[in-house]
Swiss-Prot record:
Family matches, as NCBIfam families: argB
Main localization of the protein described in the UniProt heading: cytoplasm
Keyword Nuclease assigned: no
Residues holding substrate: 67-68, 89, 193
A GO CC term assigned to this protein in UniProt: cytoplasm
Protein name (record): Acetylglutamate kinase
Entry's family note: Belongs to the acetylglutamate kinase family. ArgB subfamily.
A biological process term (GO) from this entry: arginine biosynthetic process via ornithine
Function comment: Catalyzes the ATP-dependent phosphorylation of N-acetyl-L-glutamate.
Organism: Desulfitobacterium hafniense (strain Y51)
Organism lineage string: Bacteria, Bacillati, Bacillota, Clostridia, Eubacteriales
Localization per record: Cytoplasm
Reactions catalysed, as given in the entry: N-acetyl-L-glutamate + ATP = N-acetyl-L-glutamyl 5-phosphate + ADP
GO molecular function terms noted in the UniProt entry: acetylglutamate kinase activity; ATP binding
Length: 298
């Protein structure tokens, strides 16, 4: 391929992206950043560059990050034994302190530092800042051996009760990129760990975001999980229940899709589940005709 051919290919890519850039300029896009894309340094940098490109063309990105693997690693390093009930971690006071340290003190700082190093204007927040996320202890009930429902205390695992998005709106309007850790405050003064997908979805609803992107370690929704070419590129909200009943949406994909459905019902324009392991996945999903993941819309 000659230098001219390479240049023409780049020009075609830019022209393909142009109508999408024009369409999304001035719009709010909430990005849930998690999975393998948080662990691989090269992918980290590519995600940050994608976010900065969105910001540079007038799109308003808001980032909400997870950090489960990093929390697990830190618990192991400090010798903190984890206790589980029905597969769910019990988050006691010490575990919550470690989770806050990792999410707010380490990961959030790393993300904003990387964005700023590449020329961005990123500001780190937790859900406790300006009472962005208010939570209560998440009630959990499980069926015991007698078939009766009983309450289970998982500690400082929270359920979002209220979102106060004013601080995020203010930062976005001033040209900053908010980066948010999923740690919420409660009226009892305690900190609560919030599922990052849920936190991102609730923030997207509160902002009435035009798009909500979930970076995952899967391509999206596959009609056949054994066939990577069976990706469902578009799913309507009213098709979700049927696909769950058919088993097309199953296992760990169900809570992500339910999160997508809740966001749509809360006024978000569209939700995208995409594979964050693919370099520049965000740009490929938003700025190309075919996209690379599954888009949910009303």
């Amino acid at each position: 391929m000659t230098p001219l051919d390479k240049g023409l290919d780049k020009a075609r890519v830019l022209i393909e992206a142009l109508p999408y850039i024009q369409k999304f300029t001035g719009k709010t896009v909430v990005i849930k950043y998690g999975g393998h894309a948080m662990l691989d340094q090269d992918l980290k940098e590519k995600v940050m560059l994608d976010i900065l490109l969105l910001h540079s063309v007038g799109i308003r990105p808001v980032v909400v990050h997870g950090g489960g693997p990093e929390i697990n690693s830190m618990l192991t390093r400090v010798g903190k034994e984890s206790h589980f009930v029905r597969g769910l971690r019990v988050t006691d006071k010490e575990t919550m302190e470690i989770a806050s340290m990792v999410l707010v003190g380490k990961l959030n700082t790393e993300i904003i530092s990387l964005l700023n190093r590449f020329g961005g204007k990123a500001v780190g927040l937790s859900g406790k800042d300006a009472q962005l996320l208010q939570a209560v202890k998440k009630p959990m009930k499980f069926e015991n051996s007698q078939g009766e429902l009983e309450d289970v205390d998982l500690g400082f695992v929270g359920e979002i009760e209220q979102v106060r998005p004013e601080i995020v709106i203010s930062l976005v309007e001033q040209g900053y990129i908010p980066v948010i850790s999923p740690v919420a405050g409660g009226e009892d003064g305690e900190s609560y760990n919030i599922n990052a997908d849920t936190a991102a979805g609730e923030i997207a609803k509160a902002l009435k975001a035009d798009k909500f992107l979930l970076l995952t370690d899967v391509p999206g929704v596959l009609r056949d999980v054994e066939d990577k070419d069976s990706l469902l590129s578009v799913i309507k909200e009213d098709e979700i229940s049927g696909l769950i009943d058919l088993g097309v949406i199953s296992g760990g994909m169900i809570p992500k899709v339910e999160c997508a459905r809740a966001a749509l019902q809360g006024g978000v324009g569209s939700v995208h589940i995409l594979d964050g392991r693919i370099p520049h996945a965000i740009l490929l999903e938003l700025f190309t005709d075919g996209g690379i993941g599954t888009m949910f819309n009303a």
